[in-house]
Amino acid sequence: MILEGDYRRDGAVCVRQAISDEHLRWATEAIEANLADLSPLAKRASSQDDGAFVEDFCNWDRIPEMEQFIRESPAARIAATLTESSTVRLYHDHVLVKEPGTRQHTRWHQDLPYYNVNGHQNASMWFPVDPVDRPAAIRFIAGTHRGPWYMPRTFLD
């Protein structure tokens, strides 16, 4: 595992080579199963004539591959290390899928205001299961975890 950055200072880091091919396969299978059977919480965050941008939440207890990834991948251990915690609790899983060619961009946002959680030991994790070009990759603004917080919005323009 290669850690790039200072989580406490910046609120985000890049962790490289932490997810094995096997763990990535579990995540990919979980996402495919999720897309084949969306939950009632699922939303389409793109217009109908655009490539699909779909999000879904809270499926780990009904999709075995997702539960396996959450329980057995190093994700929880990484979160514990970054937040300097001896325990980790799952608030929710959140699957975001953008098909190639999707024109809908992901609006700038902060994750913390979406959560009903106080304190500094909160971590969101993002990792692609497919190659992502730099212009399409997630970007972070260092220090925004210290506030002010902005009201959450939908991703759809």
What is each stretch, according to the model?
Residues 17-19, 100, 129-133, 144-145:
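Short loop segments at secondary-structure junctions
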Residues 94, 110, 127-131, 140-142:
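Short, structured patches in soluble enzyme cores that scaffold and shape functional sites
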Residues 116-133:
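Short, conserved beta-strand element in jelly-roll/cupin
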Residues 18, 116-118, 137, 149-150:
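Active-site-proximal flexible loops/turns
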Residues 1-10, 15-108, 113-116:
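Non-heme Fe(II)-dependent double-stranded beta-helix
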Residues 133-157:
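Double-stranded beta-helix
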Residues 72-76, 122, 156:
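A structural signal for well-ordered alpha-helical scaffolds and beta->alpha junctions
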